[in-house]
Regions:
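Acidic, Ser/Pro/Thr-rich low-complexity regulatory regions
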Residues: 1-153
């Protein structure tokens, strides 16, 4: 089997992991219910022992591990980036707080693999801003608030 085919199989296996029931629950929570206001709030959640702490850590560590595989050549970068975009959503939500989290926990490299991978994406700042807008919309929808139609320009 050639390298591209092997990489494709790894990407499919990574996708299957995302479909595990608990991971699906964690991902849904992260996208629609997790609305951090500060890095300190995220650190407090991580240390809380609450169910949501496990959800956060599952999502963050999944994407950090996956990004490490890509960054270190375990999976073809172009193939991965063309097949995935959820890592952009995760990073878009966490990016405003990354520096504060790193300072608070004393780990300068917290989520560094994810950050490095995301920052390689062409037009990344525009894409991250778009993801943040979508996240706000999805969060409002999960709370039952009125939402603007995606793509309405409002």
């Amino acid at each position: 089997m050639d390298t591209k085919a092997q990489d494709a199989l790894v990407i499919i296996e990574l996708y299957k992991l995302r479909c595990e029931p608990l991971m699906r629950t964690a991902r849904a929570w992260f996208v629609s219910e997790f609305t951090p206001q500060s890095g300190r709030q995220i650190v407090e959640l991580m240390l809380s022992g609450q169910e949501e702490s496990a959800y956060y850590r599952m999502v963050a560590s999944y994407w950090e591990t996956t990004a490490s595989l890509v960054n270190n050549g375990g999976v073809d970068e172009q193939l991965f980036l063309e097949a995935n975009s959820e890592h952009l959503v995760v990073f878009a939500k966490l990016q405003p707080f990354i520096d504060e989290i790193r300072q608070t926990i004393g780990e300068a490299d917290y989520l560094a693999h994810l950050e490095r991978l995301v920052l390689k994406v062409p037009n990344v700042e525009k894409k991250l801003e778009n993801r943040r807008s979508l996240l706000k919309s999805w969060s409002r929808a999960s709370r039952g608030e009125n939402q603007l139609a995606v793509g309405s320009g409002q």
